[in-house]
UniProtKB/Swiss-Prot annotation:
Keywords: Calcium, Disulfide bond, Glycoprotein, Heme, Hydrogen peroxide, Iron, Metal-binding, Oxidoreductase, Peroxidase, Secreted, Signal. The active site is at H76 (proton acceptor). Removal of H(2)O(2), oxidation of toxic reductants, biosynthesis and degradation of lignin, suberization, auxin catabolism, response to environmental stresses such as wounding, pathogen attack and oxidative stress. These functions might be dependent on each isozyme/isoform in each plant tissue. Its cofactor is heme b; Ca(2+). Ca(2+) 2 binds at T204, D255, S258, D263. Residues 1-22 form the signal peptide. It comes from the Eukaryota. GO terms for biological process: hydrogen peroxide catabolic process; response to oxidative stress. Disulfide bonds join C45-C125, C78-C83, C131-C332, C210-C242. Ca(2+) 1 binds at D77, V80, G82, D84, S86. Belongs to the peroxidase family. Classical plant (class III) peroxidase subfamily. The lineage of its organism: Eukaryota, Viridiplantae, Streptophyta, Embryophyta, Tracheophyta. This is Peroxidase 15. The keyword Disulfide bond applies.
Length: 338
């Protein structure tokens, strides 16, 4: 544990220095994305990124798993109404929270960290930095703080005044989806197969609940048989943690080799038939193009990091609210004047 803490501190210091010397050329991020650009808060809240980074660093130092949780929040937010912070809203008045959808109920976490980020931002720059931008920055910082790539985050999103429970239930890919369903749900958000594989690489960190992979162990095709593509010793280990009944909330690492470090081990696991979720395994077994991408990223971590950063920027640009649309929430859990 002490080694992990020291590793995270070193990464944080390197990361802070890197951000100071990076070029935030606004011309790279405009166009049809509402003129989002990295320097959006340069004048209005110059310490915004520093504040977010500091809070996330403390949270990840307390619990490394939080990095994966924050990245997952960003993913689940962007796939419903775009990256607008709708997932952060609690039920109130006309709002029916997305937190109770099938993909989020009893699994989405990290909301308290977002609250802490927002409180710090409001103290520094009231009514300035959106919850949507704060979550997008937190996802980037979570990558860096666990050893993954960094990227300049286009900023300027505003927060929604609505949520969509049905959108959350229908738009977000599920762990047991088929390959075609997963690709279709990504395509619906303007993301292609390369994005599917690269973004799935975020499963190099974090954990998943037994209920998300039990069917692979006991009833993959509805005939009472396990998924034969699972490596046998790995499957036996998983059955120890995930019984046929009960233990729904028991956790297993998404990456058995390095669940706390962002690297390309996830793709190596897929080649060895040790992907935890069905949605992981199908990337290697169901399509030649995705299989070749898995092999490429398994062989070349730098290639994976570059594509992951590019795909995260692309995902973060899904249907942003900008200009006078939406609002800047004072509290990420509720709309203003509610």
């Amino acid at each position: 544990m002490a080694r992990i803490g020291s590793f995270l501190i070193i990464l944080y210091l390197i990361y802070a220095l890197t951000l100071c010397i990076c070029d935030d050329d606004e011309s790279n991020y405009g166009g049809d994305k509402g003129n989002l650009f990295p320097g959006f808060y340069r004048s209005s809240c110059p310490r915004a990124e520093e504040i977010v980074r500091s809070v996330v660093a403390k949270a990840v130092a307390r619990e490394t798993r939080m990095a994966a949780s924050l990245m997952r929040l960003h993913f689940h937010d962007c796939f419903v109404q775009g990256c607008d912070g709708s997932l952060l809203l609690d039920t109130s008045g006309s709002i029916v929270t997305e937190k109770n959808s099938n993909p989020n109920s009893r699994s989405a976490r990290g909301f308290e960290v977002v609250d802490e980020i927002k409180a710090a931002l409001e103290n520094e720059c009231p009514n300035t930095v959106s919850c949507a931008d704060a979550l997008t920055l937190a996802a980037r910082d979570s990558s860096v703080l666990t050893g993954g790539p960094s990227w300049m985050v286009p900023l300027g999103r505003r927060d929604s005044t609505s949520a969509s429970l049905s959108g959350s239930n229908n738009n977000i890919p599920a762990p047991n989806n088929t390959f075609n369903t997963i690709v279709t749900r990504f395509n619906n958000q303007g993301l292609d197969l390369t994005d599917v594989v690269a973004l799935s690489g975020s499963h190099t960190i974090g954990f998943s609940r037994c209920t998300s992979f039990r069917q692979r162990l006991y009833n993959q095709s509805g005939n009472g048989s396990p998924d034969r593509t699972l490596e046998q010793s790995y499957a036996a280990n998983l059955r120890q943690r995930c019984p046929r009944s009960g233990g729904d909330q028991n956790l297993s690492e998404l990456d058995i080799n390095s669940a706390g470090r962002f690297d390309n081990s996830y793709f190596k696991n897929l080649i060895e038939n040790m992907g935890l979720l069905n949605s992981d395994e199908v990337l290697f077994s169901s399509n030649e193009q995705s299989r070749e991408l898995v092999k490429k990223y398994a062989e070349d971590q730098e290639e994976f990091f570059e594509q992951f950063a590019e795909s995260m920027i692309k995902m973060g640009n899904i249907s942003p609210l900008t200009g006078s649309s939406g609002e800047i929430r004072k509290n990420c859990r509720k709309i203003n004047n509610s």
